[in-house]
Amino acid sequence: ITGMIQRQLFPDEYDNVDEAVLNAAATYGTNVHASIEDFDKNWNNDGTVEVADYIEICKEHGLVHEASEYIVSDNKNWASMIDKVYRVSDDTFSIGDIKTYGVMTSEKLEKARWQLSLYAYFFELQNKKAKIDKLFIIHLRNKIKKDGTVDHINEVIFVNRIPSEICKELLEADLKEENFNNPFSIPEAVSYT
């Protein structure tokens, strides 16, 4: 799903980013995900600031962990893993995605909104009696910057769900190898010269 979102909606996002920077960011993100998953599955707190921040966020927002790396699919063409599923009630759940970006740009926020909305669509498709309550990013970071200061971020960012019909249109366009006409994109500036 993330590759399709990248291809259809954000094809130029990483064009000017050094590969070593991308690899370092991916390694850091993978390590944070693994630490948090170990806490949720095994109650193992590895002592990292990110896990401590995650525990605090769960307490502050009343998050009741239901599943990590939960696989969702349309049972035909698409499958992906939801970072975190939290139980709200017997039939209601919220979905969280862990991000470790240094800066949460508007583009990254919109990308996560699409990702979470597609996850919500698939989750409800595969769990007919379930409904999704909230979608949010768990933004965690604790890295030393080049100047020696610590880049410490621990926040929850709620996103508005994109309607399932629009999510389906995106998926169908990609399957047909067509460009998706994003109804949420901001038009290019027009020059009057």
Describe each model-derived feature in a short phrase.
Residues 1-79:
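Metal-dependent nuclease catalytic cores that hydrolyze phosphodiester bonds in DNA/RNA
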Residues 66-172:
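Mg2+/Mn2+-dependent nuclease catalytic core
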Residues 178-187:
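Charged phosphate-binding loop/patch that engages nucleotide di/tri-phosphates or the phosphate backbone
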Residues 192-193:
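Conserved small/polar residues in nucleotide/adenosyl-binding loops
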